[in-house]
Amino acid sequence: MKPVKILWHKLTPNATIPTKRAEDAGFDIYTTESDVLLQPHEKHLFKTGLAYWIDKEHWLMGVDRGSTGSRGLHIHCGICDQGYRGEIFICICNDNDFPVHFSSSAADRKSVV
C-alpha cells in the first residue's frame, strides 16, 4: 500500500497544521477559536482555518479522540470528500449537564484518512 499524500493549506495566519505521530491512527486537528463557552447539550462549529488536498480515492473523516468522550464531549462525525476545497470545521457537542469552556485551540478532533 502506497502512502497517502495530503497537503494542508492555511486559510488564516493563526491556523495550525495538523499533527500526526507515526503510531497515531490519524491527524490531530486544531481549532482557531478560543474562549468559547458551550452550554449544556449545545453544539458549535469550530473553525480550523484549514483547507486540504488529498489523493484521489481518499477522504477525511472526523471522529472523537479517546479523551473527548471522557470529558462529556462528542464530535459529530463528518466526511470531507476528496474534492472539497473549503474550510474544515469541527462540530463539537457538549453532552454534559453543565457548561464547558474552551480556552485554547485544543486538538479535539481526530481525523482519519
Regions found by a protein language model. Give the residues of each.
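DUTPase catalytic domain/fold
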Residues: 1-113
